[in-house]
Amino acid sequence: QAMINKIEQEAQLTAEKKAKDVLVTTIQRLAPEVTSDITVTTVSLPSDEMKGRIIGREGRNIRTLETLTGVDIIIDDTPEAVVISCFDPVRKEIAKESLERLISDGRIHPARIEEVVQKVTHEIQNKIYEEGERALFDLGIHNMNTDGVRALGRLYFRTSYGQNVLTHSKEVAMAASLIAAEIGVDRELAKRAAILHDIGKGAENDSDQNHAEVGAEMARKMGEDA
């Protein structure tokens, strides 16, 4: 009987280790390295006459808008539309919102463009922080520093494979918490690591590193155990 009990215990330990290995491998496979992101957005115009006003005399208006927002504005033969192109989703959103307000207002000149971009930038930065705070509150995660909150909030404006990255990160955090409970490891730590797993996708600066490496570096600078 003692031998049978020993064999059963060893079998159980082996099964638990195998289950943990399977779960870890599965999670890794569900975190692809390549980010497929939408880098362009279209702004509708009331008429094609608006294209000339957006360009401005000697191109001053469009140059001002591109310089202030860091995007490329493409004006071609597409009827009643212009295209905004930028890899940074926050810059793209600021440019889109600014251009839509300028078109609606009708006053389009360098001084007005600067005024609108400044206002929209302030609003978007506030939105970033609010979305980061909301995500952490929903998950019950505490003591994240300001940089961490903002890094998460930037993901609100990012999509990857057709999904909002902040929503995806929250879902991963909830799944990680449940899995951690099942395999007997720290749920809070798992949840915290999971919510941060994609922050590299929202990095403000372009990098040759993949998003996981960028995110790990960001987490270390934020004081997280990466």
Model-based region annotation:
Residues R29-L45, G106, H142-L155, D186-A193:
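Flexible hinge/switch segments at interdomain interfaces of large molecular machines
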Residues F87-T146:
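OB-fold/S1-family RNA-binding modules
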Residues Q1-L30, V34, A95, I113, ...:
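Long, amphipathic coiled-coil
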Residues G52, D77-R91:
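Short glycine/threonine-rich beta-strand-turn micro-motifs
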Residues G52-E66:
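Short amphipathic alpha-helix segments
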Residues Y156, T167-E171, A176-A226:
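Divalent metal-dependent catalytic cores for phosphoryl transfer on phosphate-bearing substrates
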Residues N5-I7, L13, K17, T35-P46, ...:
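Interdomain boundary/hinge elements
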Residues E130-M174, A180-D186:
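Pre-Walker A segment
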